[in-house]
Amino acid sequence: VRDYGRGIPLDKVKDVSSKMNTGGKYDSKAFKKSVGLNGVGIKAVNALSSSFFIQSYRDGMSNSVSYACGEVVSESGLTPNDEPNGPLVQFSPDGTIFKNYAYREELIEPLLKNYVFLNTGLTILLNGRKFHSRNGLVDLLNEYMTTEPLYPIIHLSGADIEVVITHSNQYGEEYYSFVNGQHTTQGGTHLTAFREAATRTIKEFYAKNFEYTDIRNGMVAAISIKVEEPVFESQTKTKLGSKDVGPDGPTIAKFIGDFLKKELDNYLHKNGEVADVML
């Protein structure tokens, strides 16, 4: 795995990959809206790999450490290097723990697609295949919808929130929700707030006595928000439990409700043809 970010600080490569509580995300200004703060994942992969190699390139220098089953085998020390900044990680799962393991691209591919949908402009390469998105969550709906939308996908975005909405002839509702880039397959407080706020805004726009269930029937939508220090209902992080967007912020329900009240209502007023089809 190779990326081209800033790179791990060269004197911290060993600590970051082997010592607990050495995550780089405690500075709230830089990483306040992350999924995890502690950097546990990389240590777990290291401990459960028969071989693990990590190298960081930064400002013309590099440093690397090799491990076997979590134990240091060798360290390169600082060496000159002309590679672009960023880390490189290579690992082989421990066959005594993961017997007959195999990488399944059909499971990896949806994760990578979601990453590019949530980070417009990001490019990810996997075994020669390229994943890229120019239109964010609009591309996500176009990728995953199994029926044609009845009207052009409504795309709304603001600080720490992105929303797409449309309807189709399918029965029921279909939602995709994300928090800080994490796909919350079980929803949570943000999805509950979105469903309520979207239907309320649509009902108020038309000023008709619609049932909420009728408004949501056939709705296909996605929402992505960023929350400071998110709380999930389990370690799998598939359902958001946070009530507020941050220690000093509004509730998630108010944040999403206020955004949709303004932006979705404005959109429907400005796009009469879409509003007519939705009706």
List each language-model region with its residue ranges.
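A short glycine-centered beta->alpha linker in the GHKL/HATPase_c
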Residues: 7-10
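Short acidic-aromatic loop segments in the C-terminal HATPase_c
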Residues: 17-21
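GHKL-family ATPase ATP-binding module
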Residues: 2-4, 15, 26-27, 33, ...
